[in-house]
UniProtKB/Swiss-Prot annotation:
Involved pathway(s): tRNA modification; tRNA-queuosine biosynthesis
Source taxonomy: Bacteria, Pseudomonadati, Pseudomonadota, Gammaproteobacteria, Candidatus Palibaumannia
Similarity annotation: Belongs to the QueA family.
Source taxon at top rank: Bacteria
Record text on subunit structure and interactions: Monomer.
Function: Transfers and isomerizes the ribose moiety from AdoMet to the 7-aminomethyl group of 7-deazaguanine (preQ1-tRNA) to give epoxyqueuosine (oQ-tRNA).
Gene Ontology terms for molecular function: S-adenosylmethionine:tRNA ribosyltransferase-isomerase activity
Cell compartment(s), UniProt: Cytoplasm
Gene it is expressed from: queA
Protein name: S-adenosylmethionine:tRNA ribosyltransferase-isomerase
GO annotation terms (biological process): queuosine biosynthetic process; tRNA wobble guanine modification
Source organism (scientific name): Baumannia cicadellinicola subsp. Homalodisca coagulata
Length: 353
């Protein structure tokens, strides 16, 4: 398929630049991946969509204040986006500047330009920076960094974004973007789900460039995802196996949860069969139409950008035509799109695990 096949008209006014006052009050478009039937609800109706014994799989990564502003020692302005913390002093980062900075360039970062970092290497699209500071990297970022809001919000970050651009269950710092499907869950809704008997487990995928990088090839099959760190612990594997054995559904909260679970599938020796196993490491899995899902039965997700890898994953799960019919209806009914926007609940039940 061609990247252009995943285009659609997204009016700028439908991009939600700010979150709703209450997380769980967004609209919810429910899509049957088999029939293509569409229903319109509010997000709290997810309680009616889930049954006793169903399993929700959340991504508990936490967004770090990864954006630093400053200048080169020579004077040119720079914007640094830290993607990977390598150790207490070194990071991999993206750097925006009028001219590509060279190795050994000294950067003066932070609002007071009192944070010193030197460029020591280049790795593909990232620069390796060495910070000259008594504090560790996460402390520096918490003190001086900005929340890296997506570019399409077209606004600076505010202090409230440090809380609002996080899921209420975020635990492990490391992401440069929120797993946005999870933003709709508040503690009251989570409690109501537990009372109903819906089970919950947590994977970790530190959302990075891989999730949102633009596709620069014409055919999607030629696209390569940059890797992201993920963990699928044995507790998740055990919960998925138990859920399947009792005939319930595994429901992924967000495309990053899908990609983590599917990355944990391994082949059984001397067999055509596969199994889910604990996984800890890098994943560059790219899911697009034609992919055979092995774990999930339903998906909660936001509305995504045209020509993006998340909309390709959704199209693989719900079917290309069903997905774009739903997106056209969402646009016509003025649903709110992207990170702070509305949500979808998609059923399919086609996993083969």
């Amino acid at each position: 398929m061609h990247v252009a096949d995943f285009s659609f008209n997204l009016p700028k006014n439908l991009i939600a630049r700010y979150p709703l006052p209450e997380r769980s009050t967004c609209r919810l478009l429910s899509l049957d991946g088999h029939s293509g039937a569409i229903k319109h609800n509010v997000f709290t109706d997810i309680l009616d969509q889930l049954s006793l014994g169903d399993l929700l799989v959340f991504n508990n990564t936490r967004v770090i204040p990864a954006r630093l502003f400053g200048r080169k020692i020579s004077g040119g302005k720079v914007e640094v986006l830290v993607e990977r913390v390598l150790d207490n002093q070194r990071v991999l980062a993206h750097i925006r500047a009028s001219k590509t900075p060279k190795i050994d360039t000294l950067l003066l970062l932070g609002d007071n330009e009192n944070i010193r970092a030197i460029i020591v290497a280049r790795h593909q699209i990232w620069f390796e920076l060495l910070f000259d500071d008594q504090r560790d990297i996460l402390t520096i970022l918490n003190d001086a960094g900005h929340i890296p809001l997506p570019y399409y919000l077209d606004r600076p970050d505010y202090s409230l974004d440090r809380e609002l651009y996080q899921t209420v269950y975020s635990q492990h710092p490391g992401a440069i973007a929120a797993p946005t499907a999870g933003l709709h869950f508040d503690q009251q809704l989570l409690s109501a789900l537990r009372v109903k008997g819906v089970e919950m487990v947590f994977i970790t995928l530190h959302v990075g460039t891989g999730t949102f990088q633009p596709i620069k090839v014409k055919k999607i099959e030629h696209h390569h995802m940059y890797s992201e760190y993920t963990e699928v612990p044995h507790t998740v594997v055990d919960a998925v196996i138990a859920c399947k054995s009792r005939g319930n559904r595994v429901v992924a909260v967000g495309t990053t949860s899908v990609r983590s679970l599917e990355s944990a599938i391994v082949s059984v020796s001397n067999s055509k069969h596969t199994m889910l196993a604990p996984f800890c490491g890098e994943t560059s899995i790219f899911i697009y139409p034609g992919y055979r899902f092995r774990v999930i039965d339903a998906l909660i997700t936001n509305f995504h950008l045209p020509q993006s890898t998340p909309i390709m994953l959704v199209s693989a799960f719900a079917g290309y035509q069903h997905t774009f019919n739903a997106y056209r209806e969402a646009v016509n009914l003025a649903y709110r799109f992207l990170s702070y926007g509305d949500a979808m609940f998609i059923t399919n039940n086609n996993s083969v695990f």
